[in-house]
Structure formats: C-alpha cells, structure tokens
Amino acid sequence: MKTLSCIFLLSLFCGQAHSLEESSFCKALVPGEYILPAEDGTWTWCMAPIYDEKGKLHIFNSVIPKKGSWIKHSKIVHWVADQPEGPYTFVEDLFSSDDASYHNPQVSMAGDTYVLVFLLNRYRDANGSKQEVGMATAKSLDGPWTESPLNPVIPASGEMNGCQIVHASNPTFVVTPEGKYRIYYKSMTDKLPLKKGFREISFAESDQIEGPYVNYEANPVISYADQQVDIEDPYAFFYEGMYYMIVEDRRGVQNLLEGNPIPADQIRNGGYRPGLIYKSKDGINWGVPEIGYQTNEIYFGDKLARSERPNILWKDGKPECLFLACHDEDPTAGYFLKIKNWNVE
C-alpha cells in the first residue's frame, strides 16, 4: 500500500489523475426498496442477508434504542422473509447484553457452518471500551449460535507499522481458494489520537474458522491515512477467480484519486458519496478502485443520506442483491439494489 501511495502522489505531480470509472458492478445495480422500518423508540442499521438451504431469506441487523448509543447498547436481531421485498418476520434478539454492544454483523457460509462476524464492544471490561471483532457460528441459521471462545477473534491490540493497534471493527469474512479463512476489517492505530485517526483496511487469517486469527504482517492493505482521508465498511468476496472489496468512501477518497481533494475542513464524514469497489488477484494488492455504487439520491430521488455497510445477498453462487444501510429521514434499516446481469470484467 505504501508503494501505491507513492505511485498515486507521483501521478498527481505529473498531472496524470483521471476520473474514477463506473464499475461493471455499479452498472448492474437496479433500485429495489427500503426495508425493515424501525420500531418506535429505536433506530436500525446494517443488514446481513443470506438464504438458507430451503430458500428462506434471513437477515441479521443492528437495533439501537434512541435513548442509548450503538457503542454501548446495540444488539443483533434476526428476521426472516420469503423475498428481499419482505414482509419480514421478527425471529429473536440474537445477541444482546448489558455488558457489551453487538453491532454491524456480516454473515457467510463456510462448508456446513454459518459464520457471523460483528463489531464487539465489551465496554465494561478493562480494555478501555475498544471496538474489536467478534464471531459466532452455527450449523443452522435458526441456531443455536455459539460465540467463539476466542472472542474477540481480532482484538484491538498488537503492532502495525510500528504503531499500536487501538481499533478493530466492521469485519467481513472470506474463504480463500486455498481453504484458509480471512477476516478483513477496519483498523486504526495510535499513530494519531483516536479521534483524529484515519480508518484503514487490514486482514487476519486462520487455518480454522474459529481461529486463532493472525494479522497479515504488512497490514494495512488499503490505506489513505497519509493523505488524511479514509474508507471503511469493507465487504469482501471471492468470485470468478478474483477478490473484490466494496467499501464506503467516508472522507472523499474518490476526490483525492481524481486529483481534486476536498479541503479537510469541508469534508462531510460518512457515506454521502458513491461507494468504491476494488479488485485483486490475491486479496492483498488492491490497486485503484472504481465506483462501486451510487447514492440513495441517485437510485430513489430522495434527499441525500448516508449509504453505508454494503452486504451482498447470494443465490446459487451468484450475487442477487446489494444491501446498504441508510440514515434517511424515514427510519429504516436501509435499502437493497438488485444486481442484474453483472458483466464481470
């Protein structure tokens, strides 16, 4: 990633910056619907969708009391439906605790095991309320789900580039072609104070689903921290012989790469801009992204709101829908976009 940063800066100096292209993935996206309206007194966030072996759709998402905060009071709940449009039936509060926050789930299947990864904040313990990565597994989407005895499977500790890791969250789980297990996640170090730090993408790998997970020695694999912009909310997958990663452009990476960086005091943090999609042969060297998805304003004609937390719903080994969390004026978990005839390049 350091090499990529140097190449990028050199290209700016040489006047070679170009507009990011709209990806073939983005071109395949068709508006769906807003779903899962929040109940009174709560707000909802993020949707992790998956079909079971009988074709029933399951969604895991975060529910937070309006009088609380996601950092301390988020829980992961479980819904089912026959189709992405719904209607949805509440199943259960899957993970909820007075001592921890469970947030931003992502669900996958590895062999005969369902894997749920999530942000875990055990705010009552001695670690200073650090955000870390948790995992739970089950043989059925209906449970029982078992939290990993190794939780947090990726702690907010250790060293990265000579700095201390102080944050690990928003994970996405991938099975590699070699049969190993990777968790890509948002990382931050103490290179700068936490509130001034910039989000990077790192990964850890294991020979077993449950772990232990070992951080890649050359983390982070995607970073623009030196340019004081960042990305987050990775959703990674391996498809048609390539790794892909869809992310939220949190602070104007697109503008930076196009040679027109937004002044720091004018950046509006969050998913108020199109998301990005990266492609890689090895899941380590990611290169320059393309536009991965547009905003809710483009898809629905609504007032611009934060579109974040991309998650793909897969059917018969192919991507069917892209789900996005959205903070709009109507309190829903977000919306989905149909993926029609994606021409993988």
Identify the role of each PLM range.
Residues M1-L4, H18-S19:
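Short, Lys/Arg-enriched, disordered terminal segments
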Residues T3-F13:
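Sec-dependent N-terminal signal peptides
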Residues H18-E345:
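Carbohydrate-active catalytic/glycan-binding domains of CAZyme proteins
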